[in-house]
Amino acid sequence: MGRRFLVTVRIQRAGRPLQERVFLVKFVRSRRPRTASCALAFVNMLLRLERILRRGPHRNPGPGDDDGQRSRSSSSAQLRCRFELRGPHYLLPPGARRSAGRLPGHAGGAARVRGSAGCARCLGSPAARLGPRAGTSRHRAIFAFRWVLFVFRWVVFVYRWERRPDRRA
């Protein structure tokens, strides 16, 4: 007695047709308690992976970009630039920040430039911006694919381990 799973991996690359790989994973119930608990943990891991894949992308994205991360208005972009990219809060007194023998802002010292580089993060398309949920669906797909590869390698390892000649009782 045991369980069997059919694991399907779909690989989509740009400019190429969809590739599908199908693996049949069999779990034979073992008499050894440790192996049985490992197999049960592996089955639970597969079921969790299937649940993650079944969820898919978010159903109702917000009014802004495709993943509902932020709104499109330029005023909100300016607010983000002002609050997110604020300069450092100095812990040392001004005398400790001076370079040796010079006063800050005088000729010969490196002047601090706060120009267009300060708001460079807010320019460009919404998908190019950094954020907690930027590119979430792509990250989920990569995570799922890595999980499947890890699981498949683990199954092969356990299968080879169980079939070793010195393990037979």
UniProtKB/Swiss-Prot annotation:
The keyword Transferase does not apply. Ubiquitinated in normal cells by TRIP12 via the ubiquitin fusion degradation (UFD) pathway, a process that mediates ubiquitination at the N-terminus, regardless of the absence of lysine residues. Ubiquitination leads to its proteasomal degradation. In cancer cells, however, TRIP12 is located in a different cell compartment, preventing ubiquitination and degradation. Residues 54-73 are annotated as: Disordered. Changing R97Q: No effect on activity. One of its GO terms (cellular component) is protein-containing complex. It is found in: Nucleus, Nucleolus; Nucleus, Nucleoplasm. Disruption phenotype: Mice lacking isoform tumor suppressor ARF of Cdkn2a display delayed mammary gland involution. InterPro entries: Tumor_suppres_ARF. Residues 1-63 are annotated as: Interaction with CDK5RAP3 and MDM2. Induction: By progesterone. Induced by activated Ras, and this requires DMTF1. Repressed by non-classical inhibitors of NF-kappa-B signaling such as doxorubicin, daunorubicin and UVC, and by the NF-kappa-B p65 subunit (RELA). One of its GO terms (biological process) is cellular response to hydrogen peroxide. Does not interact with cyclins, CDK1, CDK2, CDK4, CDK5 or CDK6. Interacts with COMMD1. Binds to BCL6, E2F1, HUWE1, MDM2, MYC, NPM1/B23, TOP1/TOPOI and UBE2I/UBC9. Interacts with TBRG1. Interacts with CDKN2AIP and E4F1. Interacts with CDK5RAP3 and MDM2; form a ternary complex involved in regulation of p53/TP53. Interacts with NOP53; the interaction is direct and promotes ARF nucleoplasmic relocalization and ubiquitin-mediated proteasomal degradation. Capable of inducing cell cycle arrest in G1 and G2 phases. Acts as a tumor suppressor. Binds to MDM2 and blocks its nucleocytoplasmic shuttling by sequestering it in the nucleolus. This inhibits the oncogenic action of MDM2 by blocking MDM2-induced degradation of p53 and enhancing p53-dependent transactivation and apoptosis. Also induces G2 arrest and apoptosis in a p53-independent manner by preventing the activation of cyclin B1/CDC2 complexes. Binds to BCL6 and down-regulates BCL6-induced transcriptional repression. This is Tumor suppressor ARF.
